């Protein structure tokens, strides 16, 4: 049976704006890929959105962030500006294990909040169409 897996997350942008300067750089490098950091160009609003998308992806995978490395979930923009979720290493393994065949991500912001949803089409091996 074909199904959907969905994850949603909401992040306060102030959490990123108010990061302790002593840990900020280490935290950002642990959570985001070099490409994500470059693309965000220091925008805490954009980084909060990417963070929410990573959390939403982990929830859709059914494992939470503890089972996958932050940097194995990469959120970058397509040429037309849409966010794209790329899965690497353990995250890709988990997606394949759960039967993910395609997925999408959506990110939205207000002045204070960043929200993301990830939806995946799940087709377990041997599923009937």
How does the language model describe each region?
Residues 1-129:
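Core catalytic alpha/beta fold that binds nucleotide/phospho-ligands
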């Amino acid at each position: 049976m074909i199904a959907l897996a969905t994850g949603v997350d909401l992040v306060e942008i102030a959490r990123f704006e108010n990061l302790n300067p002593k840990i900020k750089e280490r935290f950002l490098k642990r959570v985001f890929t070099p490409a994500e950091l470059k693309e965000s160009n220091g925008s805490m609003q954009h980084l909060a959105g990417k963070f929410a998308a990573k959390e939403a992806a982990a929830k859709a995978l059914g494992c939470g962030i503890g089972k996958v490395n932050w940097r194995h979930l990469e959120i970058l923009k397509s040429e037309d500006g849409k966010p794209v979720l790329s899965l690497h290493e353990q995250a890709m393994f988990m997606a394949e294990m759960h039967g993910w065949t395609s997925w999408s991500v959506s990110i939205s912001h207000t002045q204070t909040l960043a929200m993301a949803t990830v939806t995946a089409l799940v087709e377990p091996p041997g599923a009937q169409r």
